[in-house]
């Protein structure tokens, strides 16, 4: 590597990090028509009539993770063909390196159990994103409980083992729902987003909980793992991923992550499979704001995500459960 390239990598933060610093990559597995931005246009009863693209996009993410963590010598095997002859290849056995936690919507898992098993077999974590992608804070508690239990049971039946984590759709959480999540047997929740300017995000009071790494210890066997944001001058700046990752220049976003990792041992990032899919249908009936939120820089996300991970190649990429087990 030339001196000029080394200097540039140093300026970008490449090569930074140690074995104790960790990036928790989380993927909310839902389709483009499930999002809250389009809820007034696309009713849940019509979901089956739309082209599903979540399977293809999730496999693209799996392939990217496997390519990044490849040892020098490894045998690739082909996955099954998708519509329009789309194929992927990656190792068939779990390998050390980049692992992620996939919060899978029950609606998706019910229709695509093979995808769930594939995620699990590659060593990633299968977690719950609820069943029907409704804002939990707007639902009756008994309905939320049924949604949570149904999604957990479905995922556990598919992978043949326990599911430890939950994330509410659109981070719609409150203290009553948090108690429900604990009562239904999860080890952790990852629904709390401290950025309060988004009205969909819920609120919980964690001031009485013990700080353990970047997690909050709610009880002896239950943790909250909040989305990472920048705390600056009494403000919360959104820097956990999703649309904010697509909106900010990569150099600025990575700088924010490094700032957080100087204060904390871990960083929690989130993304959706539809955010890497420039070819998805356009919902032109949605408002300008909703369309901006959903489509901004969507053509650049895949390459940007890969570049983001490579900037932190000297860090560890465990699953959420692995992180909590190590606390």
Which stretches of residues belong to each language-model region?
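Catalytic alpha-helical scaffold of carbohydrate-active enzymes acting on polysaccharides/glycoconjugates
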Residues: 2-165, 170-232, 252-327
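Surface-exposed cleft-lining segments at the edges of enzyme active sites
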Residues: 163, 237-247
């Amino acid at each position: 590597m030339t001196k000029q390239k080394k200097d540039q990598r140093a300026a970008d933060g490449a090569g930074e990090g140690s074995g104790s610093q960790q990036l928790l990559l989380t993927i909310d597995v839902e389709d483009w028509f499930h999002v809250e931005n389009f809820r007034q246009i696309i009713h849940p009863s019509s979901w089956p009539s739309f082209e599903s693209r979540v399977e293809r996009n999730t496999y693209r993410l799996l392939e990217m993770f496997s390519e990044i963590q490849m040892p020098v010598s490894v045998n690739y095997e082909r996955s099954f063909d998708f519509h329009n002859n789309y194929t992927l290849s990656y190792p068939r056995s779990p390998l050390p390196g980049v692992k992620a936690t996939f919060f899978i919507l029950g609606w998706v898992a019910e229709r695509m159990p093979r995808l769930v098993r594939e995620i699990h077999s590659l060593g990633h974590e299968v977690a719950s994103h609820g069943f029907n992608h409704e804002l939990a804070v707007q639902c009756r508690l008994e309905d939320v409980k049924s949604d949570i239990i149904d999604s957990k049971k479905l995922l556990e039946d598919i992978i043949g083992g326990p599911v430890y984590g939950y994330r509410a759709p659109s981070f719609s959480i409150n203290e009553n729902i948090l108690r429900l999540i604990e009562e239904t047997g999860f080890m952790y929740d990852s629904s709390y987003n401290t950025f309060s300017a988004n009205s969909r995000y819920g609120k919980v009071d964690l001031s009485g909980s013990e700080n353990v790494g970047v997690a909050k210890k709610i009880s002896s066997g239950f943790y909250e793992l909040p989305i990472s944001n920048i705390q600056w001058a009494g403000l919360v700046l959104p820097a956990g991923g999703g649309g904010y990752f697509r909106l900010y220049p990569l150099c600025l976003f990575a700088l924010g992550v490094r700032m957080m990792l100087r204060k904390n041992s871990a960083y929690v990032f989130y993304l959706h499979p539809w955010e890497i899919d420039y070819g998805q249908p356009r919902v032109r009936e949605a408002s300008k704001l909703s369309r901006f939120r959903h489509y901004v820089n969507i053509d650049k996300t895949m390459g940007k995500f890969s570049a983001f991970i490579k900037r932190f190649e000297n860090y560890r990429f465990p699953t959420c459960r692995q992180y909590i087990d190590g606390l």
